[in-house]
């Protein structure tokens, strides 16, 4: 759903910003 898509995008952004991926 939309909420799941937003959550997934948020995780990608957090991963990129943290430099852990």
Swiss-Prot record:
The lineage of its organism: Eukaryota, Metazoa, Chordata, Craniata, Vertebrata. The keyword rRNA processing does not apply. It comes from Odorrana hosii (Hose's rock frog). Belongs to the frog skin active peptide (FSAP) family. Brevinin subfamily. This is Nigrocin-2HSa. The keyword Secreted applies. It comes from the Eukaryota. InterPro entries: Nigrocin. Keywords: Amphibian defense peptide, Antibiotic, Antimicrobial, Disulfide bond, Secreted. Disulfide bonds join 15-21. GO terms for biological process: defense response to Gram-negative bacterium; defense response to Gram-positive bacterium.
